[in-house]
Every structure is written in structure tokens, then in C-alpha cells.
From Swiss-Prot:
Keywords: Cytoplasm, Transferase. This is Thiosulfate sulfurtransferase GlpE. It is found in: Cytoplasm. Residues 16-104 form the Rhodanese domain. Gene3D superfamilies: Rhodanese-like domain. One of its GO terms (molecular function) is thiosulfate-cyanide sulfurtransferase activity. SUPFAM superfamilies: Rhodanese/Cell cycle control phosphatase (SSF52821). GO terms for biological process: glycerol metabolic process. The gene is glpE. It comes from Ectopseudomonas mendocina (strain ymp). Belongs to the GlpE family. PANTHER family: FAD-DEPENDENT OXIDOREDUCTASE (PTHR43031), THIOSULFATE SULFURTRANSFERASE GLPE (PTHR43031:SF6). It catalyses: thiosulfate + hydrogen cyanide = thiocyanate + sulfite + 2 H(+); thiosulfate + [thioredoxin]-dithiol = [thioredoxin]-disulfide + hydrogen sulfide + sulfite + 2 H(+). Transferase that catalyzes the transfer of sulfur from thiosulfate to thiophilic acceptors such as cyanide or dithiols. May function in a CysM-independent thiosulfate assimilation pathway by catalyzing the conversion of thiosulfate to sulfite, which can then be used for L-cysteine biosynthesis.
């Protein structure tokens, strides 16, 4: 399995302030109801396009519901050539509890 690191919401916030890309792998309805501000929804349909156009050297944070599914996705993305990949511990649920003002709604960011 490819290398990624698990990080806390506080560590993710620091990376975000330094330009990290955040992707959310939850279902589209959950993403539309609330997500990390500035994050991009990533699913099987948008994955290829995302990888093709992404900066593989930019820090990448993967978020899911509770921090479990994001680990598999982070490992996959690291295997696709991303050099600095992180899985958000606690997922969006812990993020929302920690940084409620850093969330957004809607289907696109």
C-alpha cells in the first residue's frame, strides 16, 4: 500500500492555510449538505480528470465521513503519483465539530 499520513483537523487546517488541496469522497448529497470550505467532491466519475489535471506535488488532504474510507482513497491517490497525501482523522464530522466556520454548502466549490 502506498504511503500517506493520518492527520488531525488542526493539522489539516494548517496545511489548508498553506495551499493544500482538499478532496471529499463522500456521496454527492452529503457533500452538498456540508463540506470543508474550498474542498472538491471526488468520486469515480471525476477521479480520472482530477488526477490528470492535479499538481502531484501539492499537498492533498482526503476527507470522508469519519476518517475510515479516506485512508483507502489516500493510499490509492499516493499510488497514482501524489507525493504528499493525508487522510483526515475523524473525517468531515470531526472537522465540522472543530471548525464549524470553515464549512460550506452546495454541490460545487
Amino acid at each position: 500500500m502506498s504511503e500517506f499520513k493520518r492527520i488531525s483537523p488542526q493539522q489539516a487546517q494548517e496545511l489548508r492555510s498553506n495551499g493544500a488541496v482538499v478532496v471529499d469522497i463522500r456521496d454527492p448529497q452529503s457533500f452538498a449538505l456540508g463540506h470543508i470550505s474550498g474542498s472538491r467532491h471526488l468520486d469515480n466519475h471525476s477521479l480520472h480528470d482530477f488526477i490528470t489535471h492535479a499538481d502531484l506535488d501539492a499537498p492533498l488532504i482526503v476527507s470522508c465521513y469519519h476518517g475510515n474510507s479516506s485512508q483507502s482513497a489516500a493510499a490509492y491517490l499516493a499510488g497514482q503519483g501524489f507525493s504528499e497525501v493525508y487522510s483526515l482523522d475523524g473525517g468531515f464530522e470531526l472537522w465540522r465539530a472543530t471548525f464549524p466556520s470553515e464549512t460550506a454548502q452546495g454541490s460545487e466549490e
